[in-house]
Amino acid sequence: PCFESADELSLKRKILLKQGKPPIYDRTALRLKKSEIQSLIQSGKRPHWRLKLDDETIEWSDMIHGKIIFSNLSVSDPVVFRSDEMPLFTITSVVDDADTEVSHVFRGDDHITNTAAQIKLFKLIDAKIPEFGHFPLIKSISGQGLSKRSDDFSVRKFRKQKVSQLVLINYLQKIGTNQSFENIDDMKTLYKNFNINNFSKNSVFFDPNDIERINSKYLKNLEIKT
């Protein structure tokens, strides 16, 4: 059980960063005595709960990045339950994946740290660990991460621009690979040619101008055929 407020944790993080140190949780809560914990709870403070990571080195063969070795000492003990007793993604996804026997997990490489903690959780509940693959994040041409709050890359915007659904699907499947955007494949061909080994480990850039150019060429070819 941990009792630090969000402001207290934020201050600790800022101090560590200012000192040039990684913002790792200092495990203050581990030094609390049982009597102190009881006193804090009786005073009305509600704890959040962290999973204490041991000194074990976690490693896995990532389907995109290859072998990843992760030292638990380099990350904070993850919060698994909030102070309102609501479980967080780190633990709920593990329980759900184990229960439904998920075999493969693909997500962005900003989840690599989560994966290290979740592999530990899979081991703790004696569940089969799925295969993991972490895609590089897609960025805008300016190098910024894509935001759900921005309309620049929304499906709504592409629909208004009359972008073909097939063009957009082709672009999203081929971005970050060595496959040409110029060839617009049907869904069966896309499915047949999909290979996880084609994806780059490096960040990729989403250029709306490419979509517009490819779509224009695709629509012209359709007009010629008809």
Which role fits each region the language model picked out?
Residues 113, 125-226:
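Catalytic adenosine-cofactor/nucleotide-binding cores of aminoacyl-tRNA synthetases and other
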Residues 5-148, 154-158, 179:
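Active-site cores that bind ATP or allylic diphosphates and position pyrophosphate for catalysis
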